[in-house]
Amino acid sequence: MKVVYVGRDSKRHKALVAQHLDVIVLLHDNWDDFTYKTTFPTECRIKGSDVEIGGIQILIENEKTTFAYLDKLVADGWDGVFPIPGSQYVSVPASLSFYEQIDGHLGLDAAIEVARTLRDASFLAKIEDDGDALRLLATEGFRKSLQRERGAIKAYLDGWKLFGRKTISIGNQIFRFRKPGEDISTIELRFASASPLPHDINVMIGPNGVGKSQLLHQIVANWLKLDPDIPADTGFNGRPNLNQVVVISYSPFELFPVDTSQDKNRKDHDVYRYFGFRGRMKSLTESKRGSDKITLSREFPKTNAARSLLACLSDDQKYGAIKEWSKKLETMERVLKSAFPFDRAAVVIDGDADVDSFFATQEWMTEPYLEGPAWDEDGPNLQVRYVPIASDRVDELKVLVLGKHLQDRLGVVFLKDGKPLHLSSGQRLFSYIVINILGAIRRNSLILIDEPELFLHPTLEIAFIRMLKSILASYGSKALVATHSLVAVREIPRDCVHVFEQTDQGLAIKTPPFET
């Protein structure tokens, strides 16, 4: 597979895409990582079709601005085809999906060939023990630029496992944290297990004020740090091989960050996702310009779920060729049908929109959409269309068009026998949480859940833990739950239960002496 740098040369870019069935084209980007400019967006064609693989960062020895160095080579006669002549360099993709997509479409040999061509840091350091690569890995440029974003860190830590066909999983994690006015405490999250019992979920239990939610907030703050050289006495012990942190918290009093949109120094904003009753909403300021103000609203679970269901569809379309991909819509249907019966989940679309524009084809579809009134507890009935988002029609639906006409404030509607299904408030919130997690989750994510008993009654709380186990297993991910409830603890092995207790000597974290 050919890899070619074109930079700003749009004419050559178009010609390469038109001429080659299998090609990766590297484009120009001026993104600055602590004075290093190493980032390249890509366009990838495989077997004549567009495939989304994400960007890549390339560090050249003794150079801070990679595109300027490559532009000079092109001016001196280089045709832009990799490998770069007469240069020592290493690269790291923005995420593991870069090579997973190539593997899924063309096979592992093709992915390894591209890794050699781009001198992938993980492949060269951990499989080939390449001395030139190891020297570059010890530089400031690699540490501050190629290992700045969490997706790139994960790609470096675990990329070699993909090339060696080894299982990529999250191991035990040690985290140091501090309660105000107290010494540092340490918790070991036991995610790796030699026993047959799954260790995908760890639970913290203890009274209010003992430090459980404080720990979750400190995990988020540490995860969102960008500069690896900032000294800290708290945080993860080493760089965790995580892809993403997702927070689920439906307390009206919590103050987790709702997103990272205000962080202009961050390129990958999906590395952290939050779902709860808080979010950004446009409001008019004194100057009459719209500003994104963080507000509290029970609309957010509904709007997030509608958007997340389309995200599940989009991910299944983009990443379906990856060998280890667990299809999100199939997972959603399997998990939720164990909680209540339904035929399909649907989104609500404008009643006056051109319905044909939502579909690539309707030829093989039964009931591509339904029409009827939308029951909205907060407003008048509207005449709308329900478009099922289901695993049997992934390739027939157009995500971008659906997104433009989406009535997201009406949430996700479940259809049974051709009619909207009425759910209790608990069932609705349960379904929204499942869909939100699936819409956001990447492989090897850490899900943080704060006090699920606040928003789920005991029967649904048990179903929630079992649902969580199923999703985590499908995506190689883990969860940490803070709770007061013994219901959740009963579903978890004893060595994954952390009992928080305030003593005269400070905070004590213990494991139950017997299976819970």
Where are these regions (language model features)?
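Switch/communication elements of ASCE P-loop NTPase nucleotide-binding domains
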Residues: 177-236, 403-516
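Short acidic (Asp/Glu) and glycine-rich catalytic loops that position anionic groups and cofactors
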Residues: 245, 313-314, 502-506
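A structural signal for short, well-ordered beta-strand segments and their strand-loop junctions
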Residues: 246-249, 344-350, 448, 480-481, ...
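Extended helical coiled-coil dimerization/tether regions that scaffold
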Residues: 128-195, 280-425, 435-442
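ABC ATPase nucleotide-binding domain signature region
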Residues: 60-123, 128, 226-308
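A generic secondary-structure signal for well-formed alpha-helical elements
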Residues: 223-227, 252-253, 340-344, 472
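A broad structural signal for short, well-ordered beta-strand segments within beta-sheet-rich domains
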Residues: 170-172, 242, 476
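Long, basic/Gly/Ser/Thr-rich N-terminal segments
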Residues: 1-167
